[in-house]
Amino acid sequence: MKILFHFTITLFVLSLVACNQIKSPEPVKQYAFIGGKEGDKIDTTCFDSLQLSDPFILADEETQMYYLVGSGGSLWKSTNLKMWTGPYQYITVDTTSWIGTAPRIWAPELHKYKDKYYCFVTFTNPKIIVDTVPNRYNVQRRATHILTSDKVAGPYHPISDKNYLPEGWSTLDGSFWEEDGVPYMVFCHEWMQTVNGIINYIQLAPDLSESM
């Protein structure tokens, strides 16, 4: 009887240990288009009829076209810089990440680097507060992220889940810079958090997947 009792207790303890060692499954990533307006009619219009903040134009030699992006997350195409066709959605993200399903999309830039295309874009999730400046501002989660695509018109997706900058910093307006074969991201540490805004830079990995 004692042997059976000890054997039962041993099995029970081993079961508890095994249960504690089983890791909870990681949430399933859910990639989706964000920005722009799904279902928008694709049309061609003259440049002076477009309403867009923080515009950026990439002249792509491979397709012999110009690509215009700006805050809001839409893309337009043109062959002559006068007439533009769009808007197209081109940004996809994991909506289970901190970015969420409806982030603010600011100041995107498209760059070609080593035969791939990259989108430097600032996301803001107003539901996440990372800092508080007394009598001034509740600092929302805001950061520049780098997305990539094999095609200039996308879809673009995050290179990795890694943060390029501390998540407690409110950063924006990231831009690409290369010097002596070394890639960098130039960015702004926002004045709403620092009082005096700071323009800074970080060195990037050769594939732009993380900061060095």
Where are these regions (language model features)?
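Bacterial Sec-dependent N-terminal signal peptides
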Residues: 1-28
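Carbohydrate-active catalytic/glycan-binding domains of CAZyme proteins
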Residues: 19-212
